[in-house]
Design a protein with these regions (language model features):
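Acidic, two-metal ion nucleic-acid-processing modules in DNA metabolism proteins
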Residues: 1-91, 99, 103-106, 135-245
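Long, low-complexity, charged/polar intrinsically disordered regions in eukaryotic proteins
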Residues: 100-138
Length: 245
């Protein structure tokens, strides 16, 4: 997809409006600069662009390139699902396949996951779109995760999808593996099966989350959560060529 985005201010009869302009990146009037990189792919920085999803959807429809859109967070997917060309190209870390262009509407929570995605996709071009990291306080985070555990116990036969947890809450899979191990340790559940993709649990009940909050192991997990948020912030704010080395 050889396009870039920039806003243009228009004034007519005293009325001012802002229009999103889509540029061909091979055009002489290019505004969106390619970031110099030592990687095998070209990096395009759209992190601070104000973009219109309908326009992007239309451009993707016209493109001849094989385009993939990385999104795992439900709240981000909900913003693009009504645009068929975008939605049909959405993939998670496990669904990603080789492509020409990879667009990050969602940001991985750790370098390991980012590297896995890029290795699978082997893209020629990578676009980083604007993104708002999902940040929660400890109480909100644990309450949300606990709700997901209860839902899995009552509706999914005890199967907890680690990627879904990671995508929904914007954290690494390792965070949720450690959390589930801690929940088992304090007696909230028993893990009957586990692998890198999912856990199967026998839910016992959650009587007091302070058992988790006051655990020294949770302090270590919280440090991991902070590291995830710092990595996503780095992808959003820092020199992409350096972050992606």
């Amino acid at each position: 997809m050889d396009i870039a985005f920039h806003p243009q201010i228009n004034e007519f009869n005293g009325n001012v409006s802002v229009q999103l302009i889509i540029d061909d990146i091979h055009s002489d009037s290019i505004v969106d600069e390619e970031i110099p990189s030592q990687n095998q792919y070209k990096i395009f920085d759209n992190r601070k662009k104000v973009w219109n999803l309908q326009n992007i959807n239309n451009e993707i429809k016209k493109a001849s390139s094989n385009i993939k859109v990385f999104i795992e967070s439900k709240y981000i997917y909900d913003t693009v699902k009504k645009y068929p060309e975008l939605a049909s190209r959405v993939c998670s870390r496990y669904e990603i396949t080789k492509c020409d262009v990879l667009m990050f509407f969602d940001y991985p929570a750790d370098k390991k996951t980012l590297d896995i995605i890029l290795e699978k996709a082997q893209p020629k071009k990578v676009h980083f779109m604007s993104y708002e990291p999902k940040v929660m306080d400890e109480a909100e985070f644990l309450k949300t995760f606990t709700g997901m555990v209860k839902f899995a116990a009552h509706n999914m036969g005890g199967k907890i999808d680690l990627v879904r947890c990671a995508g929904f809450l914007g954290k690494s899979i390792e965070v949720f593996q450690r959390l589930l191990d801690l929940y088992e340790e304090v007696g909230f559940l028993t893990v009957t099966d586990r692998n890198n993709a999912f856990y199967i649990i026998d839910f016992k009940g959650i009587d007091d989350l302070s058992k988790v909050l006051h655990s020294t192991k949770y302090a270590e997990i919280f440090d991991m959560i902070v590291e995830c948020e710092a990595f996503q912030r780095s992808l959003l704010e820092d020199d992409l060529a350096e972050v992606l080395l």
